[in-house]
Design a protein with these regions (language model features):
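Short, cationic-aromatic polyanion-contact patches
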Residues: 1-7, 21, 52-76
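Amphipathic alpha-helical dimerization/coiled-coil segments
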Residues: 73-107
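Key DNA-contact positions within bacterial/archaeal DNA-binding proteins
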Residues: 23, 34, 38
């Protein structure tokens, strides 16, 4: 099972462009081709994406990875989770900056 961040990145990128190849995803996400394949297979098994194949302009079989309604819901859930984490991190950093500023000014 892919970790939350890998799952989110793949779902987000495939929602933007369902015709990306595994090699393109690997390059864009900065992970190995094997990891992309593993993550995609996991997402297919749990029903977050489905695969369609088609012939491209060179008459080669290519795959399209489409988010299912379950996949869209999971991406939304992960987006909210990451937003919450980042908001909490921001608030903590803001407090640290205020402490440092107050310490420097003698308040």
């Amino acid at each position: 099972m892919p970790n939350q961040q890998s799952k989110y990145q793949l779902l987000k990128r495939l929602e933007q462009d369902s015709n990306l190849t595994q090699r393109q995803l690997s390059k864009e996400l900065g992970v190995s081709l094997g990891k992309v394949n593993y993550c995609l297979q996991s997402l297919i098994q749990i029903g977050f994406i489905k695969v369609n194949n088609f012939k491209n302009s060179n008459h080669k079989t290519q795959y399209s990875y489409l988010l299912t309604p379950k996949g869209v819901a999971e991406k939304t859930k992960l987006t909210l989770m990451f937003l919450k984490v980042k908001t909490e991190e921001y608030e903590e950093l803001k407090k640290e900056v205020e402490k440092s500023t107050n310490a420097e000014t003698g308040k």
